[in-house]
């Protein structure tokens, strides 16, 4: 992150004989402390969002004048430099507020277009309690999964390549359901996403996860593991508030392991924030 901010010769517009001289010209040193209260392998895009947060803080402190699009682009570069791979969807999801449809064009340089969608399905009293997030206590990091999927794409794997236009059309269907405030359609499309995830990666739904889903699937319109799958959090769309109560009771009484628990989720209306004290 500091390299991308110019604290390395390859990324600096000015030349310095040493880092000490550069910091002297800058006027101070920099100490960075990180805290992420989310477990590794959560599937919530935490590594990308944390990287964006660090870049956003450095941007503010150093007066680099990056906007949110710049921060998201530099996050992609940072993750490539760290060899973690990944795309841009996680940081755009976290840095920008609310519900969004993200669209990009083909090409090496990606400049996603952000279109905001209404939040009615997530905040209206009829639907708010139907969105459930459950930590499974099972972890699986995304790096190796991403490498396998990208490799399959480059090797022209037919099953993988045929999924791409389906996933694009599915995103547009989901956007339309949200625009129309069609809760039933939204929930079932979440379930379709889960089916597509499993077709993309056979390790998405291991037996331990399948056992959790089996207990609650009859009370849901749809469910999926966010991110690469295989562990982390389980997002569920209950059929109605009463069904949501049943899901909470079942998974609380029959927790698969001591780490498993429900966590409260709300929609961010601010996105990335940087404050000074």
Give names to the regions the model predicted:
Residues 43-64:
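DPxDG-like acidic metal-binding loop motif
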Residues 40-44, 199:
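A generic structural signal for short coil/turn motifs at secondary-structure boundaries
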Residues 44-46, 223-228:
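Short glycine/threonine-rich catalytic loop with a Thr-x-Gly-x-Asp
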Residues 232:
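Conserved glycine-rich beta-strand-loop-beta hairpin in the small C-terminal domain of fold type I
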Residues 28-40:
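Glycine/charged-rich beta-loop-alpha catalytic/anionic-binding loops adjacent to active sites
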Residues 2-25, 35, 62-64, 68, ...:
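C-terminal nucleotide
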